[in-house]
Amino acid sequence: MKSNLKYIVLLVVLTAMFNMANAQSAKDSIYNEIAHMDSVMFNAFNSRDVEKFKSLFTQDLEFYHDKGGLTNYEHTVNFMEDVAKSNNELRRDLVKGSLEVYPIPGYGAMEIGVHTFCHLENGKKDCGTFKFVHIWQKKNGEWKITRVVSYDH
């Protein structure tokens, strides 16, 4: 009897360890996917690739900004087009170590982080560091942002 109980306990422990390892592996995988998509999006932003940038958002995008209010896909695209035309060298960089990613089962993932934007103003570099949340949806194998919250400006 005691021998059977030991095997049952061992089986339960091994199963729990296996499930924890699989859960961590899935979390690492989605983290890597979103970190990559963040890089793709802001490489497009920094290189002024408007078409690539546009392709990373859904048409029903909601963009919440603590200073600018609620805007949409069209406003975001127009902003990117203005950035591409300007010569102020606006650039975004993710603050190293700030990225957090949480799965949203059946939908996608939530990306939380801190980023710095720098641009030239009167010939001098002007930078600000801000917080953000991106809600990514994975549909037909493609990641796109459906919601943005930009805050702490």
Annotate each language-model stretch with its function.
Residues 101-109, 123, 136-142:
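A short, structured loop/turn motif at beta-sheet edges
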Residues 129-153:
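Short beta-strand edge/turn micro-motifs at domain boundaries
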Residues 1-29:
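Bacterial Sec-dependent N-terminal signal peptides
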Residues 28, 32-33, 50-107, 114-116, ...:
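A solvent-exposed, acidic/Ser-Thr-rich amphipathic alpha-helical stretch
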Residues 41, 48-49:
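Short helix-adjacent coil turns
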Residues 24-25, 122-127:
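A short acidic/glycine-rich loop-to-helix N-cap element
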Residues 35, 39-43:
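Amphipathic alpha-helical repeat scaffolds
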